[in-house]
Amino acid sequence: ESFRLFDDIPGEILVTIIKETDKTTRNDITRFRNSQNAVKGKDLIALEAFHTGIRAQLSRLGYFYEQQAGGWLFLKETDKAGAYTGHNIYRKYLPAEHENCISSSDAIQCMVAGIFQNPTKPYSSKASFMPYGASYSKIFNDRLEQDYRLLFYPYLIRSYSETIGYGQLDSQPTQKRYARLLFVTAYFKILFDFVLKKTIDEIKAEPKLLEPIFMNFDANKELLVFTESIMEHYFGDAQYHYDSLNAEEEKSVTWHNFFSNYAWDAELQKRLASHVK
């Protein structure tokens, strides 16, 4: 029995055009692409020259900067063991089980929280800081130095926070479960305002100012411990603010919602600074 052919049906197809003459870079871009899947922001990072440069810088330190989902998973075990062995000092900030792979999306999130002093927006919408996201061009523009320190150092601080109980399901107090990025923000606020006494713009223009701090883990550990003590005061202030919000008529705020919208408002910033002083 013959089947009737369907009439022509209009449709659409997504086409990605890669304008890159270097074969190695082309292969990097296409290696993990699956034509059946939609292109996501975290995949488009592979198309960004800025992040390719960061990957090269971090590889010299023994870390794999994963620009594209699957990059680390599909890397040969011999390459992992030979090229990505970590750094003698920087590994002290990381959990013992860390694989020396740094997700670009996590690093971006940490940079916005630390260097740009904004913990709430990257917490509430990680995707907005990916390529073509609403906030990407506000961060990645010609005013941002292509320097691994701007991404790597905030990532190290978030990783350190995990070693002291931040981001865990059973974290106590409960706020610690949601406060990894807030810890990053608090650390860099203390570092910028009270230790280096530099503005955000000055640090962005000269990221090397951060290196002596991070290369001296023992001294920096004291600042990290101090930040943790300040966060204990912050959690008390946050609890009061949280309770006040929920006491308002027709207001129901979860801790997730709190850290997405209220955790770094002007009053809580002022309170944190007062504890430091």
Residue ranges and their predicted role:
Residues 1-3:
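A sequence-level detector for short glycine-anchored, His/Arg-bearing signature motifs
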